[in-house]
């Protein structure tokens, strides 16, 4: 059973997919979105769901450090609700505190250039969200 992980931001959605056994997460792509124009990349996510035969989607929920829900987390919750209605699959919200920071740290330690980091950080954050989910549920 393949599971998709999403790191939803205001400009991009990082996408990761699990292996067929649900043990490891791999980055797939970063989808460009535009909240101001109401372009959220749902169609591309649906294409990837079909292509990879995904059975469940995990959306990162960026809670505040004190466990409260801020504006970014509210946006992620709405994204998850709309996505679930559009694709007809279960969508799970998963605490993703500090995943983008951890992803950036990993890329800096790997000596990845700033330009390249910007291109891959959301995809890596999606991998971290999905891998955390897989590690906890397997």
From Swiss-Prot:
It comes from the Bacteria. It is found in: Cytoplasm. It is an enzyme of class 3 (hydrolase). Coiled coil: none annotated. One of its GO terms (cellular component) is cytoplasm. Its main location: cytoplasm. Its EC number is 3.1.-.-. GO terms for molecular function: nuclease activity. One of its GO terms (biological process) is rRNA 5'-end processing. Signal peptide: none annotated. Keywords: Cytoplasm, Hydrolase, Nuclease, Ribosome biogenesis. NCBIfam families: RNAse_H_YqgF. Could be a nuclease involved in processing of the 5'-end of pre-16S rRNA. Belongs to the YqgF nuclease family. This is Putative pre-16S rRNA nuclease. It comes from Listeria monocytogenes serovar 1/2a (strain ATCC BAA-679 / EGD-e).
């Amino acid at each position: 059973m393949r599971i998709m992980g999403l790191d939803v931001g205001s400009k991009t959605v990082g996408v990761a997919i699990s292996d067929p056994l649900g043990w490891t997460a791999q980055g797939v792509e970063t989808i460009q979105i535009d909240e101001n124009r109401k372009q959220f990349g749902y169609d591309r996510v649906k294409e990837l769901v079909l292509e990879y035969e995904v059975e469940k989607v995990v959306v990162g929920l960026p809670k505040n450090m004190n466990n409260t829900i801020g504006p970014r987390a509210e946006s992620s919750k709405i994204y998850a609700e709309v996505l679930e209605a559009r694709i007809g699959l279960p969508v799970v919200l998963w605490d993703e505190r500090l995943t983008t920071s951890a992803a950036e740290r990993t890329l800096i330690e790997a000596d990845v250039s700033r330009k390249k980091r910007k291109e891959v950080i959301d995809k890596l954050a999606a991998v971290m969200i999905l891998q955390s989910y897989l590690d906890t549920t397997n």
